[in-house]
Structure formats: structure tokens, C-alpha cells
Amino acid sequence: MNSKFDRIIHHMEKLNYTWDEQFKDTGLVCEQLEKDEFQPDVIVGISRGGLIPGVMMSHKLNVPFKPVHASTRDFPHWENYLPRPSDKKILIVDDICDSGETFEKLSTYIKENINHECDVRFMSLWWNNESEFEPHYFVKEVAKFTNPVWIEFAHENWWI
């Protein structure tokens, strides 16, 4: 263990989220979008966790994909490719919505600086249902404050 962060995670319950689960759940989210009749103009994948499901959804829905490096630590410095002012329907994707703070800040930034009339929606494969922010689309829920758990995504440990 190299850091305080590693020691904290070592003592938490771990949930292993496999490639098969992620592929299946990403497909389920695409079905939710279709049922909701929401066809985004662009999918924004938050680095790093939102890149894989974002790219998968981009191919399935035949929609442009834009990666963005966004975290609450970096706010308001958003790197890479943000939506264009002409993008009216924007789907922002991440692997997990823990507190929702990154989603909220990115939504505010887009609406204040790019297009204040756009429809910004959020998708995460996992949602911490004890946070105040609820994404529009998600597949799995966890109560991370009551039951501290670390969700280990396949892309985080594929070489082990």
C-alpha cells in the first residue's frame, strides 16, 4: 500500500464490476434512452470512468463522442472537448455518481458558458442513492455512506 487512499480502500468492502456486467448495463442504459425518446446530439464522457461506457453508447446510438477531463478538484478547469453551442441535447456519462458534484458543476458550466438553453442529462452505471444528485439514467444503486464500498471496475484491474 502506497498511500493513505490505498489504506482506506483496503479496509472497505469491494464490489468487482466485471466487463460482462458493464457491457450488459451499458446496453440497458441505451434502452432507457430509447424508451425516454432522448437522442443526444453529443455524448460527453468524463475521464476516466465515463470514457468506456460513453464510447460504447456513442457507437450504439451513432452520436458523436467527446471526452472531457472533469473532476471537482479541477473545477473550473475543464480540459479537452466540450459540447458546441449548437448541441441542444447533451448526455454526460460517468461510471459512478458518488456525490453528484462533478455532474452539477459541469452542467452549470455548460449552461452558463456554452448554451444556456440546452437539455443536459446525466448517466452513470452506478448511483450512490444517498447523494442529493440523481442522474437521469443509471442501472445499479449503492448506499455508500451507510455501507462504505469500493466499486472496482474491470478497467481498473484488468491486468490482475
Regions found by a protein language model. Give the residues of each.
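PRPP-associated nucleotide enzymes
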Residues: M1-I160
